[in-house]
Regions:
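Short gly/pro-enriched beta-turn/loop segments at secondary-structure junctions
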Residues: 132-135, 147
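FMN-binding flavodoxin-like domain, especially the glycine-rich phosphate-binding loop
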Residues: 1-133
């Protein structure tokens, strides 16, 4: 959760943890590294879900796996899930749909059917694809009332609550 900051979470080797990460340009958003620095796997098993806007996951599952392994998790599964694109909702509109949900249920059933969850390798390449961002940032218009809802909802605090007309492009992950 991007909006939860600064508290430690520890798991044990008896735990099975599901991580759902957003994918931007085939990569994890950099704030995920900070958030994960507070998470301690201690041998817990991890299932990774890369959520992307109908473009491509590219190296994201491998990057997620490396991040989780470095935090003490054993990666035992991974899946790609399509959702509406975060900027242009026409891409991935109506997703996940019934076939997507069926595929996810099949994946979950296969995990549950295993006698023992063992580590698996995730697809992707090292070094990861370079992510240069996209030159699109939230902006306000004459319709902006200055209510600050956008600043409250922004997961990376890129929009200044005192001046919601301003977006810090260095923090924005859009």
């Amino acid at each position: 959760d991007y909006t939860t900051r600064g508290y430690e979470v520890s798991f044990s080797s008896d735990d099975l943890v599901f991580f759902c990460f957003p994918v931007y340009g085939g990569r994890l958003p950099t704030p995920m590294y900070d958030r994960m620095s507070y998470v301690h796997g201690n041998g817990a098993k991890a299932v990774l879900v890369a959520v992307y806007g109908n473009r491509a996951v590219e190296d994201a599952l491998l990057e997620m796996s490396d991040l989780c392994l470095n935090r003490g998790f054993k990666v035992v599964g991974g899946a790609e899930m399509i959702a509406p694109h975060s900027i242009d909702k026409r891409f991935g509109a109506g997703r996940p749909d019934a076939p997507d949900i069926a595929a996810l249920n099949k994946f979950l059933s296969s995990l549950m059917a295993k006698q023992e969850l063992t580590p698996v390798a995730m697809p992707g390449k090292r070094p990861y694809k370079e992510y240069k961002g996209i030159p699109v940032y939230p902006t306000s218009s004459s319709k902006c009332s200055g209510c600050g809802t956008c600043a409250q909802e922004c997961p990376t605090e890129a929009i200044d609550p005192g001046d919601p007309q301003h977006t810090d492009k260095s923090k924005c992950i859009s």
